């Protein structure tokens, strides 16, 4: 399963570390391999503990537009561009995981409808 991450701050770095460290356990439990294929950040020159530099991109729109993603994890926060990026990921066939309370409170119905229409999942917590 190919995973993209939107946001590489404190939370994003931890999510990236967990995704990379837990691949064997996930594969043993599910029969699927997890592969972190990209992390969208504002500044690719910053050191990001737990995130290999070759995975960093400042082209979030390009990352979520890939047609081969299975899951997009959004940890960037805020309403925009998170909303547009999630809608693009959904349109391109990726399921989405977010803990973005502000986004889900204001656009949860729109995002849920888009995911339902596209036949993908939208998971959220802490919302």
What is each stretch, according to the model?
Residues 82-92, 99-127:
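Rossmann-fold NAD(P)-binding glycine/threonine-rich loop
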Residues 1-92:
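N-terminal glycine-/serine-/threonine-rich beta1-alpha1-beta2 phosphate-ribose binding loop
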């Amino acid at each position: 399963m190919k995973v993209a991450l939107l946001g590489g701050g404190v939370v994003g770095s931890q999510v990236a570390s967990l995704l990379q460290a837990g691949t064997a356990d996930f594969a043993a439990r599910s029969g699927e391999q997890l592969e972190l294929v990209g992390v969208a950040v504002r500044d690719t020159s910053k050191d990001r503990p737990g995130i290999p530099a070759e995975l960093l991109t400042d082209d979030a729109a390009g990352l979520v537009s890939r047609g081969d993603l299975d899951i997009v994890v959004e940890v960037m926060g805020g309403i925009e561009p998170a909303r547009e990026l999630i809608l693009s990921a959904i349109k391109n066939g990726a399921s989405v995981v977010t803990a973005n309370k502000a986004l889900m409170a204001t656009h949860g119905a729109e995002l849920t409808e888009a995911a339902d229409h596209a036949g993908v999942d939208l998971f959220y917590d802490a919302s």
